Amino acid sequence: MREIVSIQCGQAGMNQVSTAFWSTITDEHGLDADGHLRPDASSLESDRLDVFFNEASNKKYVPRAVAVDLEPATLDAIRSGPLGHIYRPDNLISGESGAGNNWAKGFYTEGAELMDSVMDIIRREAEQSESLQGFQLAHSLGGGTGSGLGTLLLTKIREEYPDRMLSTYSVLPSPKVSDTVTEPYNAVLSFHQLIDNADATYCLDNEALYDICEKTLKINRPSHQDLNSLIALVMSGVTTGLRYPGQLNGDLRKLAVNLVPFPRLHFFTTGFAPLFAKNSRAFHNLTVPELTQQLFNPANVMAACNPYHGRYLTISTIFRGQVAMKEVEDAIHTARTKYSPYFVEWIPNNVQTSVCNVPPKGLTTSATFIANSTAVQELFERTANQFSVMFKRKGFLHWYTGEGMEPVEFSEAQSDLEDLILEYQQYQNAGVDEDEELMDHEEYADEGVEDFN
């Protein structure tokens, strides 16, 4: 089997997002809360269980997951939660003091002290795999543990497993939903590591997730559970081709090869359809063209950037349910033609489609959208600007230098992110003649969502 080891780091990555992900895929693969196959589980559901689960004694399936946090409360919440019995107990590793929203504590001091024990567990999971394809990390870039310890783990895994794929689901901080003043520092220092050590980074942020919950799902006061359920939908959709047999479905490497034209440009935005309010039945059975229309709607992007402010380098779509490949290809071709000014001209065949006949629970059809768009630079620019304001006046810098960091590390991380922004701008403008076509389609960028309703 082509196994994937999942690493859950920090409160956002571990207790919340990953719990929602495991809840989703245990249900999709016919497992109960204790990891046993339900009597009604189909062979299709159980056929590729080994990718994300390891069969233990008594026919119990245990997630290939390592959960790490620098304070014990998060792990205690996992143990006492609805999936507490499914994890391997010694794969839950915690410190005692927390990271205090400080990247340096996660990367250099508190996190570094846990590194040997965490890597021992990761090695054991890798050794128990017949043909390990790679790792996926779920973490937040705003706090101290997910950002600092999470990216430290990436560097260690990259050193030890240089030929394995590393994917991350990274929750970016956003000014409208801010937990701590040091988030811009933590995020920029994390990007510096993600640029060098990740093969694919799925960018998500709470601002976009809140907007989807409020405007599309009609939830008045979205909870963290609501946001995490959205991320779990995306993680489930992205990993569909890894977990089920299907048409044109590949592995982590094939997905990255199709989406990443240049190694540093591996930051993706995602979307999911259908999204609808709980009391609405209108979208439960969308056609393939309707699903495709939702995928290209900027209101469905789970990161706070507008794809029509940039250009698509590459796209991958994953449709689920009893849909014909020809119908999917026709719908995508129509959308590709309609929005052609928003695709770069110099990458041929830059839209990949795949179909899995197993729909998500509770739906007859669904679709997941992965885009490598130059518009992702909006996320980077926002964070870089906030970083610059703080760094110029050396705000809170002593919290980091007190953990052994040097100011030059901040400057290097800042320069690396600014270089990345310039690279996205360069490839956005390559081959564009005075942006004439874009000017003719300006209404998509200006009006945004209205064109899709």
UniProtKB/Swiss-Prot annotation:
Source organism, top-level taxon: Eukaryota
Gene Ontology terms: biological process: microtubule-based process
Binding site for GTP: Q11, E71, S140, G144, T145, G146, N206, N228
Primary location: cytoplasm
Binding site for Mg(2+): E71
InterPro entries reported for this sequence: Beta-tubulin_BS, Beta_tubulin, Tub_FtsZ_C, Tubulin, Tubulin/FtsZ-like_C, Tubulin/FtsZ_2-layer-sand-dom, Tubulin/FtsZ_GTPase_sf, Tubulin_C
GO molecular function ontology, one term from the record: metal ion binding
Protein's cellular compartments: Cytoplasm, Cytoskeleton
Assembly: Dimer of alpha and beta chains. A typical microtubule is a hollow water-filled tube with an outer diameter of 25 nm and an inner diameter of 15 nM. Alpha-beta heterodimers associate head-to-tail to form protofilaments running lengthwise along the microtubule wall with the beta-tubulin subunit facing the microtubule plus end conferring a structural polarity. Microtubules usually have 13 protofilaments but different protofilament numbers can be found in some organisms and specialized cells.
Task performed by this protein: Tubulin is the major constituent of microtubules, a cylinder consisting of laterally associated linear protofilaments composed of alpha- and beta-tubulin heterodimers. Microtubules grow by the addition of GTP-tubulin dimers to the microtubule end, where a stabilizing cap forms. Below the cap, tubulin dimers are in GDP-bound state, owing to GTPase activity of alpha-tubulin.
Protein family according to the UniProt entry: Belongs to the tubulin family.
Annotated protein name in UniProt: Tubulin beta-2 chain
Organism: Geotrichum candidum
